[in-house]
Design a protein with these regions (language model features):
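Conserved Rossmann-like nucleotide-cofactor binding loop
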Residues: 11-13
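Nucleotide/phosphate-binding catalytic cleft detector across ATP-hydrolyzing
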Residues: 1-8, 17-131
Length: 131
C-alpha cells in the first residue's frame, strides 16, 4: 500500500510518497516519489501575520498538484501537516478550508512538539540505508 505525507513548512511544501516493504523480516519505507515546492509562506506571514493573496494562490495550486500526483501513484493514505507559518497565519483556517474544497485534502496544523515527535518517530521507523 502506498502512502503520502505532505509537509507544509515555512519555506517549502513537500510531498513524499512511500511504500512499506518487508524484506528479511524487516520493514522499511521505499521512497516512490518526492516533490518539493519552495513556497516561502513564511515571508508573508512573518511580515504581516497573514499569507498574502499571491502566496495563498500558489499554495492552493501546489496542493492541487500534490493531489494529482497522489492519484497518479495510487496513494491510499495521505496526511498533510502544516507547521510554523500556518500556525502563525491569521488567515490559515480560511486557506485550509479552500484547499479542502478544491482538493479534498485536509491540512492539519500541528504544534511544534508534535512536529518534533513526527520527525523523531520517522527517523526511527525508517531503514536509512534503504530510504
Amino acid at each position: 500500500m502506498k502512502f503520502g505525507a505532505i509537509d507544509i513548512g515555512t519555506n517549502a511544501a513537500r510531498l513524499l510518497i512511500g511504500e512499506v516493504i518487508q524484506e528479511d523480516g524487516k520493514k522499511f519505507v521505499n521512497k516512490v516519489s518526492y516533490t518539493r515546492i519552495p513556497l516561502r509562506l513564511g515571508e508573508s506571514v512573518f511580515e504581516s501575520g497573514r499569507i498574502n493573496k499571491r502566496k495563498s494562490e500558489q499554495f492552493v495550486k501546489t496542493m492541487r498538484a500534490f493531489q494529482l500526483i497522489s492519484e497518479l501513484f495510487e496513494v491510499k493514505e495521505l496526511r498533510a501537516c502544516a507547521t510554523s507559518a500556518m500556525r502563525e497565519a491569521k488567515n490559515g483556517k480560511k486557506i485550509k478550508n479552500k484547499i479542502f474544497q478544491e482538493t479534498g485534502i485536509e491540512v492539519e496544523t500541528i504544534s511544534g512538539n508534535e512536529e518534533a515527535n513526527l520527525i523523531f518517530g520517522t527517523f526511527f521507523l525508517m531503514d536509512i540505508d534503504k530510504a
